[in-house]
Swiss-Prot record:
This is ATP synthase subunit alpha. The gene is atpA. Its main location: membrane. The keyword Signal does not apply. Its EC number is 7.1.2.2. It is an enzyme of class 7 (translocase). GO terms for cellular component: plasma membrane; proton-transporting ATP synthase complex. It holds the Pfam family ATP-synt_ab. It is found in: Cell inner membrane.
Length: 513
C-alpha cells in the first residue's frame, strides 16, 4: 500500500490535532542550608504559611518563616541525609491528619500514623491540624458535667462539657494520674477521649497505654504520641493533631475529652524551633507569639450549638450539641505559677486545679489545693446531688486551714475551735482517693452526705478510710437499685435525702466498720 504526500500530510495534521499536552505549573525551590531540622529554601515564590513542602525521599517540611529571599521550613522527621542543592516543591496543601472512629483504641504519632503494631487504620477522612475555633454565636454555655470520679475535683472544682480546665503543679505531684483517671471514668459515659503525650519518655507512655487497657478505657481513647525522642516539630504539632481528632466527634454532636500532657514541653519545643528560625526572643527566650500558640489551641475546645452541628453535618444530625473538653497540663518549677507559660495558660483556661507537692508528700492524694484551685464555669454543670452536698466542703477546708495555722501557736483551744479542726481533718482524710479508682456520682453523694450532716463526728480520724469503704460496700450490696438510679440521674430531693440518711444511719447502727 502506497500513500501519496497529501494523505501523509492529512494524517500528520490529524495526529497533531489529537495531541494534547497537559501542562502543570509547579513551584520548585532549592535547599540552601540544613541545620538542626531547619532548612532554608530559595526559589519558592508561591508558598503559603504552614504549607507542606515535599522533600526528596517522600518526606515533608512545613513552611514557618516567609522571608524576602528565602523560606525557613521545619522538617517533619529525619533530616541527616538532606543536603544543599537538593530540589524541593510546594504541595499547595496544609498539614492534615486522619480522623474518625477507626482511631479509637489506637496509638498514633503526630501525623496520625499507627505505631502500635495493630495494622492500618480505617479512617473516615482527613482534617487540617490548624482550624479556626468556633465563633461566639456557634457556642453554647457549659451546663453538662464531666465526672472525673475524684471527690475533691467533682465537689470543689467541677468540670463541664466544653470547658478548659488547667491541671498545674510541680513534677511528681500526680498531674498525669489525675488526667488518666478522668479518662478511665469516661469508659461508660459515652465521652470519647484523646490523650496527647508530648515530650515524655516512651516507657512512661507505654505504661499509660497499658493502664488504660487494663481498666477498659483504651477502646474509647485515641493516644497521640510525640515522645522525647521525636523532633521538636512533631512535639509542637502533636496537640493540634489530637485536637483535630477530637473535633471530629464535637462537630458531629458527640462529646469528647482531650488531655494535653503537657503544654510546657510543647512551648519548649516551639521555643527551640523559633530560635533556630532566628525569630526574636522575648521573655524567658520564648517567641512573641507563644500566647497565641496556646490560645488558638485551647479556644478550639468548646460546646457547640445544635445549629452548628446541623450545618456541619448537612442536616444528618439534628437537635444535638457537641463538645470538646480540654484538660491541659502545665508543669511548674518549685510552685512558681507566675512564670511566663503558666500565667498565659491560666489566663486562657476556665479555671485551674493546682496540685501541691507539700500536700502530695504528706499523703494527701489527689494533692488538690482547694484555696487556689477554681472552676469558673463548671459549677453550672455540677449534678444536683454533688452541688447540694458539697457546699460546706470548701468552707470547712478553708476554716480548717486558717485555724490549723492559728492552732500551732495557741495552747488551749475552746470546744468550737476543736470541733472545727477535727471536722476539717476528717474532711481532708475523706477526700483522699487511690489512683485508678474513680467513684460514680452515687458513691460520692453518699460520702459527702455523711460528711455534711455530721455522721463522721464520732469516727476516729484513723478509721475514716475504712468507714468510707465499708459504707460504700454496704450501700452497693443492700441498696443496689437506689445507688444505680442515683448514679444515672444525679438528682437530689427530699426523698433521696431521706434514703441517704437511712443508709448511713442503718450502717452506723450495724457497726460493721
Amino acid at each position: 500500500m502506497q500513500l501519496n504526500s497529501t494523505e501523509i500530510s492529512e494524517l500528520i495534521k490529524k495526529r497533531i490535532a489529537q495531541f494534547d499536552v497537559v501542562s502543570e505549573a509547579q513551584s520548585t525551590g532549592t535547599i540552601v542550608s540544613v541545620s538542626d531540622g531547619i532548612i532554608r529554601i530559595h526559589g519558592l515564590a508561591d508558598v503559603m504559611q504552614g504549607e507542606m513542602i515535599e522533600l526528596p525521599g517522600n518526606r515533608y517540611a512545613i513552611a514557618l518563616n516567609l522571608e524576602r529571599d528565602s523560606v525557613g521550613a521545619v522538617v517533619m522527621g529525619p533530616y541527616a541525609d538532606l543536603a544543599e542543592g537538593m530540589s524541593v516543591k510546594c504541595t499547595g496543601r496544609i498539614l492534615e491528619v486522619p480522623v474518625g472512629r477507626g482511631l479509637l483504641g489506637r496509638v498514633v504519632n503526630t501525623l496520625g500514623q499507627p505505631i502500635d503494631g495493630k495494622g492500618e487504620i480505617d479512617n473516615d477522612g482527613f482534617s487540617p491540624v490548624e482550624v479556626i475555633a468556633p465563633g461566639v454565636i456557634d457556642r453554647q454555655s457549659v451546663d453538662q458535667p464531666v465526672q472525673t470520679g475524684y471527690k475533691a475535683v467533682d465537689s470543689m472544682v467541677p468540670i463541664g462539657r466544653g470547658q478548659r480546665e488547667l491541671i498545674i503543679g510541680d513534677r511528681q505531684t500526680g498531674k498525669t494520674a489525675l488526667a488518666i483517671d478522668a479518662i478511665i471514668a469516661q469508659k461508660d459515659s459515652g465521652i470519647k477521649c484523646i490523650y496527647v503525650a508530648i515530650g515524655q519518655k516512651a516507657s512512661t507512655i507505654a505504661n499509660v497505654v497499658r493502664k488504660l487497657e487494663e481498666h477498659g478505657a483504651l477502646a474509647n481513647t485515641i493516644v497521640v504520641v510525640a515522645s522525647a525522642s521525636e523532633s521538636a516539630a512533631l512535639q509542637y504539632l502533636a496537640p493540634y493533631s489530637g485536637c483535630a481528632m477530637g473535633e471530629y466527634f464535637r462537630d458531629r454532636g458527640e462529646d469528647a475529652l482531650i488531655v494535653y500532657d503537657d503544654l510546657s514541653k510543647q512551648a519548649v519545643a516551639y521555643r527551640q524551633i523559633s530560635l533556630l528560625l532566628r525569630r526574636p526572643p522575648g521573655r524567658e527566650a520564648f517567641p512573641g507569639d507563644v500566647f497565641y500558640l496556646h490560645s488558638r489551641l485551647l479556644e478550639r475546645a468548646a460546646r457547640v450549638s445544635a445549629d452548628y452541628v446541623e450545618r456541619f453535618t448537612n442536616g444528618a444530625v439534628k437537635g444535638q450539641t457537641g463538645s470538646l473538653t480540654a484538660l491541659p497540663i502545665i508543669e511548674t518549677q518549685a510552685g512558681d505559677v507566675s512564670a511566663f507559660v503558666p500565667t498565659n495558660v491560666i489566663s486562657i483556661t476556665d479555671g485551674q486545679i493546682f496540685l501541691e507537692s507539700s500536700l502530695f508528700n504528706s499523703g494527701i492524694r489527689p494533692a488538690v489545693n482547694p484555696g487556689i484551685s477554681v472552676s469558673r464555669v463548671g459549677s453550672a454543670a455540677q449534678t444536683k446531688a454533688i452541688k447540694k452536698l458539697s457546699g460546706g466542703i470548701r468552707t470547712a477546708l478553708a476554716q480548717y486551714r486558717e485555724l490549723a495555722a492559728f492552732a500551732q501557736f495557741a495552747s488551749d483551744l475552746d470546744d468550737a475551735t476543736r470541733k472545727q479542726l477535727s471536722h476539717g481533718q476528717k474532711v481532708t482524710e475523706l477526700l483522699k482517693q487511690k489512683q485508678f479508682a474513680p467513684m460514680p456520682v452515687s458513691e460520692q453523694a453518699l460520702v459527702l452526705f455523711a460528711a455534711e450532716f455530721g455522721y463522721l463526728d464520732d469516727v476516729e480520724l484513723e478509721r475514716i478510710g475504712s468507714f468510707e469503704s465499708a459504707l460504700l460496700a454496704y450501700a452497693n450490696s443492700n441498696h443496689t437499685d437506689f445507688m444505680k438510679n442515683l448514679a444515672k440521674s444525679g438528682d437530689y430531693n427530699d426523698s433521696i435525702k431521706d434514703q441517704l440518711k437511712t443508709i448511713v444511719e442503718d450502717f452506723k447502727k450495724n457497726g460493721a466498720w
